């Protein structure tokens, strides 16, 4: 009698991907951070979609929408905390994934490493935009501090900061 995980069409795919995965026996736990990144990213997307359903860009009602999510939405507080802590876990896994690549010398594969660096910058830019764009529900101080780092660029830094802010200071919601 054959095992159902090897004969059923859907279970066979899962079996070949996870259980009978052709991987070397000396693989360490450092190699699972890519999978954890995928899980964290899926969690971020799902919780972000559900939180966006209650989004309001008006600075006067932004705090009320957050309290509405936490108090009135079923398990809204769980969504909010999963989204916040999921972002932290995502970046922890990301940095450990990069650290594993450094430790095992993956930087020797130049094309692969350069693509990873591009993806790292894209992820950081996306996270920054996700933090800065909904002005009404984020920290003006955080946006000011993060974007002020650009002022350290010689000659064009201050002009670049003013261009990103659209003026001399961060103000009002940008998403409507």
UniProtKB/Swiss-Prot annotation:
Heme 1 (or BL or b562) is low-potential and absorbs at about 562 nm, and heme 2 (or BH or b566) is high-potential and absorbs at about 566 nm. Binds 2 heme b groups non-covalently. Pfam families: Cytochrome_B. Disulfide bonds: none annotated. Its main location: mitochondrion. GO terms for biological process: mitochondrial electron transport, ubiquinol to cytochrome c. PROSITE patterns: CYTB_NTER. It is a multi-pass membrane protein. This is Cytochrome b. CDD domains: Cytochrome_b_N. It comes from Lasionycteris noctivagans (Silver-haired bat). The cytochrome bc1 complex contains 11 subunits: 3 respiratory subunits (MT-CYB, CYC1 and UQCRFS1), 2 core proteins (UQCRC1 and UQCRC2) and 6 low-molecular weight proteins (UQCRH/QCR6, UQCRB/QCR7, UQCRQ/QCR8, UQCR10/QCR9, UQCR11/QCR10 and a cleavage product of UQCRFS1). This cytochrome bc1 complex then forms a dimer. Keywords: Electron transport, Heme, Iron, Membrane, Metal-binding, Mitochondrion, Mitochondrion inner membrane, Respiratory chain, Transmembrane, Transmembrane helix, Transport, Ubiquinone. It is found in: Mitochondrion inner membrane. Its cofactor is heme b. One of its GO terms (molecular function) is ubiquinol-cytochrome-c reductase activity. Heme b b566 binds at residue 97. It comes from the Eukaryota. InterPro entries: Cyt_b/b6_N, Cytb/b6-like_sf, Cytochrome_b_N_euk/bac, Di-haem_cyt_TM. GO terms for cellular component: mitochondrial inner membrane. Heme b b562 binds at residue 83. The lineage of its organism: Eukaryota, Metazoa, Chordata, Craniata, Vertebrata. The keyword Lipid biosynthesis does not apply. Belongs to the cytochrome b family. The chain crosses the membrane at residues 33-53, 77-98, 113-133. Component of the ubiquinol-cytochrome c reductase complex (complex III or cytochrome b-c1 complex) that is part of the mitochondrial respiratory chain. The b-c1 complex mediates electron transfer from ubiquinol to cytochrome c. Contributes to the generation of a proton gradient across the mitochondrial membrane that is then used for ATP synthesis.
């Amino acid at each position: 009698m054959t095992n159902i995980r090897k004969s059923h069409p859907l279970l066979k795919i899962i079996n070949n991907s996870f259980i009978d995965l052709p991987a070397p026996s000396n693989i360490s736990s450092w190699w699972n951070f890519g999978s954890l990144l995928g899980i964290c990213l899926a969690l971020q997307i799902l919780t972000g979609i559900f939180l966006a359903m209650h989004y309001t860009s008006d600075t006067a009602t932004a705090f009320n929408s957050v309290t509405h999510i936490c108090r009135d939405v079923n398990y809204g507080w769980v969504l909010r905390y999963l989204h916040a802590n999921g972002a932290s876990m995502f970046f922890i896994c990301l940095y450990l994934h990069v650290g594993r690549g450094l430790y095992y010398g993956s930087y020797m594969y130049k094309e692969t490493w350069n693509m990873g660096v591009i993806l790292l910058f894209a992820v950081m830019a996306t996270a920054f935009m996700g933090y800065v764009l909904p002005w009404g529900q984020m920290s003006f101080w955080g946006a000011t501090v993060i974007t002020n780092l650009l002022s350290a660029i010689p000659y064009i830094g201050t002009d670049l900061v003013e261009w990103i802010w659209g003026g001399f200071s961060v103000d009002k919601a940008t998403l409507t």
